[in-house]
Amino acid sequence: MISVVSGACATITEEDIARLEPLIEQSSYLLMQLEVNLEANWRVLALAKQHGVTTILNTAPAQSLPDEILSQIDIVTPNEVEAEMLTGIPVENVENAYKAAQVFFEKGVKAVVITLGSRGVYVATPEKQQLLPVPKVDVLDTTGAGDAFNGGFVTALSEGKDLWEAARFANALASLSVQRMGTTASMPTRAEIDQFLAEHPEM
């Protein structure tokens, strides 16, 4: 079980956000998650859209979101539990992942990346859908796997990789992280990620 004690994360102010606007303006991507006060998230989202920044929402922890917010998200990265909460479709197989993605598209999201644990990651745009497999690994601790995936995903996008290659890179990062205990301490080096990808061309 993962518990959230928001603390300072629930107290982000308009002044805090205003100080960040120059950084947002210079950015290519904005990655958000739901462990901060939501009004702060939506203010940052508005700034990102104002400056033409690609917006990515990691929908953790799972909760319902208004359609007017989802319509401003370029890429959404839920796990299967979060995808079901936001679409009403249990993501138990690829067919249902496809259906869930269609619901997100109807809400205005441009790309959907659903992490499916040991089943891999389902990546979809209105034009292309694909399940990317994940190699079997010895799982020790899944805490932080979603953070590992999302961090790797945005890193790869910022390096110019397309949606599918970015998801593949993120899959590798998360696969390595779950083989170690902890969160920050479990994150692999870039060399380890590149080696893992080279050893698993089937990903």
Predicted regions located by residue number:
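A short alpha-helix capping/helix-coil boundary motif
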Residues: 1, 21-25, 78-81, 131, ...
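Conserved N-terminal subdomain of the carbohydrate kinase-like
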Residues: 1-31, 46, 193-203
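Conserved beta-alpha-beta core of the PfkB/ribokinase-like small-molecule kinase fold
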Residues: 6, 16-17, 29-99, 119-121
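Short aromatic/basic micro-patch
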Residues: 11, 77, 187
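Structured loop/turn residues at beta-strand edges in well-structured enzyme cores
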Residues: 22-25, 71, 107
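Conserved phosphate-binding/catalytic region of the ribokinase-like
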Residues: 63-69, 94-203
